[in-house]
Amino acid sequence: MSNSRQFIGRLSKLGRDVLPSNAALWLYGSRARGTAQADSDWDLLILLDEDQQKSTDFEKYAYPFTLMAAEDNQMIIPQIYTKKQWKQMAFTPFVKNVEHDKIVLV
């Protein structure tokens, strides 16, 4: 897909369709910073409001995004964390960078 804004809109819609209502979906990395190349991947962060992750979370919540991207010859790198895990990692450079660059999609 040539239009990044349209693709971001589709990501947001898919997030609203597949994620629980209390989940968050963020775009981060080069696509969020506006420094992406045409072949850059899409970095997505899914935050679930659960006590702990379940073995089915990736298939249920992340896989639909990778499938959508593959249909458009794009690559999505989804990361899933619980909100509790995310807070526990707040001191890490990864979390600080994501929090700085993120675009909230859901």
Where would I find each of the regions flagged by the language model?
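Catalytic core of pol beta-like nucleotidyltransferases
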Residues: 1-26, 32-38, 49-106
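Short beta-strand->loop micro-motif that forms the acidic, two-metal-ion catalytic signature
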Residues: 42-47
